[in-house]
Amino acid sequence: MSGWWIGLIVVLAAIAGWGVWLMVGRNRVVFGEVEILNPDGGAGTALVVYHPGKSDFQRRVFAGFAEGLVAGGWRVELTTPSPLTPTGLDGVDLLVLGGPTYGFKPNRPIQAYLNRLGDLGAKPTVTIITALGMGQRSTRIMEQLVRRANGTLVKALVLYKARPNDEDNPVGGSQNQDLAVEIATRAAKTIDLAAL
């Protein structure tokens, strides 16, 4: 076999390995503790479950959303979707689900967690999808999954790491990511349990 063919096989194997890492490695379950913010919050209890992905963007967005809820007086339970994540929603007034999109779909751990929850019993639910630049399809899928599980969709956000989050005033790089966090925080501040 010539060196050219061997080189081609090595390149194709590397591309295949990278593809497997993208789809499997990024979709792996991350075990996280339940972090309780504002334990005495009287506005209601929100369970925020998100897949952290491979960068800190998801963590920042969901921390911003949690911060907005806390500013509104909510008790927030923040965690990741794993087999250990609580599935009992008694005492939970608002469910927040999301994380990164991979392969134009919501990440597998959040889909599996939503499956484990079963019937949401009309629970008010917010979805937050993060993406590099194309998250609309993933957001639609997440909305459908919540509705199919008998959840009441309160809000669906899609926030971008690279694509401008404000088409009228585009900013790039870290400014765009900071804007995504700010949008998440503002969105959380508008959620009023009495109006749900």
Label for each model-derived stretch:
Residues 83-84, 163:
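Short connector loops at secondary-structure junctions
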Residues 2-77, 91-99, 103-196:
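FMN-binding flavodoxin-like domain, especially the glycine-rich phosphate-binding loop
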